[in-house]
Each structure stands twice: as C-alpha cells, then as structure tokens.
C-alpha cells in the first residue's frame, strides 16, 4: 500500500553518529556555554546568594539577588581584590545597594550593603539616627499592614521604620530599645579601626568620607558588620549594584524547602 520514498540518484545516505562523536558534540556545547557564561558573570551580570540578615527587611536570608556589574564600569573577568577595571563610567551613589569585597577578607568574601555616604560626605549616627552633612534622616514608623507586605510578618510588629534622606527612602530595622551596643570584637577587645572608645553602633562619628571611598551599612542596623567596624571601602572594590531580588527560598530542617513566592522579582528600594 505504501511505497518507500526513493532516494535521489547519487545521494549518499548519512552515516550514523558514533557514541564518541555524540559525546564530543556535547563537550563542545558545554565548552561554548562555559566560554560565554564566565565572562558574562565576571563582567556583566551575576547573582548573589544572601546568607545573613544584615540587610533585613530589604533583603532576607534565602534571597538570590541580581547584580548589575555594568553599573559603574566594565571589569576584567575573574579578578577579585584588587578589582581590575577596563574602564569606569560611574561611581556608587547614596542609597545604592551594592556588592563589595570585605576589607577584612578581600580575597573571597563578598558583602551586600547599602551606601549611606560617599566621598566628601560627613556622616554621623545620633541615637541610631543617620545624619549626613548635618541633615538628619526622617524616620516614620510603619504600620502593621505595611510591615506584613515587606516581610510577611516574620519579624514582629513595629520594629521597622521608613528611613528617608535627600536621596533615598527605604525600610530599616531599628534596635528594639535605645541601649547602646559597644563595638566589640570577640573576646571583648575594642575595634581599633576608629580608635574612639566612646563610639557605639548607634552613636558614631562624625567622620568625613575620603574621595574615592564609600561608607556602607546594613539596613538591619543592630546586627550588621559594616563600615562602623571595618572602615571605608574603596569605590573600585564595589563589584556592582543590585536592583532586584530574583527569587527566594530556604532549605529548612527535614529537609524542607520553603519557597518565598512573594519575594520573586521584587525591586530593591
């Protein structure tokens, strides 16, 4: 009933690929993908897994955040500290959420923090309130419904405030009381970076940021290890800016995977 399709005269039938040829094709495909992804992640875009709560409530543990590595310039791929730049066309600004290398362990540890002061700025903390160039930030308590939209109710009520400066407005976690926490190392030794024994996490400064440097802090002011501990960060050590959370999940006991759907593709203020 059905006739086989006749091959045109002179057409040579295709030889079947051997197992080795098939493997080689896969190897070539993976090599090409690797060759594209390495410079892409090294110089253009990347992601960062957030392990701690120092940026709560803006960024929480389990978030995977997008990193724009072209925000301030084009970086040589696969270089760490000191970062090597092909060219730079911008600098971090107040309010930027950035990824930078830790001055305490610059060879492998990256941090996510917020830039609160840039070169030439004078910064001070008075009873936990941020003061930039003599102007104190405004703080507005957030009501219960707004807090639930931010964190899903995971941190409790009335711990957040909206911190507003001339450049930016974002939620921060305020200390639960007005006590001062001395800046101490493990073992009770005072941090010698600033050599000011009267300074604390909530009463700090004033300090003037040198040109080409930035002062960074976590939005969770009472549990962030930041420039109050390790000092200024050179602008060239800021890897990129983070504009958004891509997705969020935590591996809990069991093991059980907790997916935070409401945090997917959330903009970072």
Residue ranges and their predicted role:
Residues 25-43:
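Hydrophobic membrane-insertion alpha-helices, especially the h-region
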Residues 39-53:
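Aromatic-capped interface at the extracytoplasmic side
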Residues 2-22, 46-49, 57-269:
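Soluble "head" domains of membrane/secretory-pathway proteins
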